[in-house]
Amino acid sequence: MREWIPVSTSPRGRLALAAVKQFGARSFDQVMVGDLAAAAEVTTGAIYHHFGSKLGLYEFVREDVERRLLDRMEGAVAAGNETDRSAAVQAALLVGFDFAVREGFLRILGAPPAGAEQDRLAALLKESTATASPVLGPVLAAAWRAALIAVAEGAKPRQARAALLALEIRPQ
């Protein structure tokens, strides 16, 4: 459980909210510290004070956004048909995709985890598709992220969603 819940009016909370918007719309490298500080109406020093670095802020907001995504996807898998895991996994992919598009989290969720961080999306999908193939989870996670990046780069969401619908998961 999280030790700190952001208060949107505090400098730390404003930074977190600004970072979610900035990193959702642009890649990590495209977001400048000065832009984050200006959007949050704080000095750049506040970023270093509260998060240690731009990467620390990114990791903080990515973890939060990813947790919200996984909660929705886990719910879709759990609500799915036990006898048709393919339909449950496909529903989870679509629920997650719709959430990311609606909230504007295309870039932050479209990028794979940085460094040694565990890929929790791939782990969820691997667990949900274990009977089909041991590598299917990471493959589906990559396809899902590619759909988000396609939308971020101008593809219509319905086209990317249709591509996800075209994925077929069959037991071996």
Can you annotate each of these PLM segments?
Residues M1-S10, Q172:
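N-terminal intrinsically disordered/low-complexity leader segments
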Residues E63-L69, E74:
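Short, basic, alpha-helical segments at the C-terminal edge of helix-turn-helix-like DNA-binding modules
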Residues P11-R14, A18-G56, F60:
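Helix-turn-helix
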